[in-house]
């Protein structure tokens, strides 16, 4: 969740991403960890990987892996997908014109409208969102009126 802490726009919001808070999150990270271990033991990589450093071969069970992951997991500080786009005001934040449901004159134009995080840096897709938003706003108000 995101919580606005102040009316001052310079005060950062509280962002609680709820990492690993659902069973599907846990299962996906465990599956990914197992896949990485399997790849590391494949003939091409086994030639150059002497041993697993972290979490180490002594960490094997799902509970042990999750304990390690919960203790060491971090973020790359590219929060996205916090303002779902859709037509339903009760479950979505913005419509397809980037307007916030229920608030006149407010649009969200940033990475928070992404449906999922991109596999690379968020800068270029965020610029594309901005460009699309500019087109939407110009179209809505008429280019000559802006």
Predicted regions and their residues:
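FAD-dependent oxidoreductase catalytic-site/capping-region signature
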Residues: 1-125, 133-146
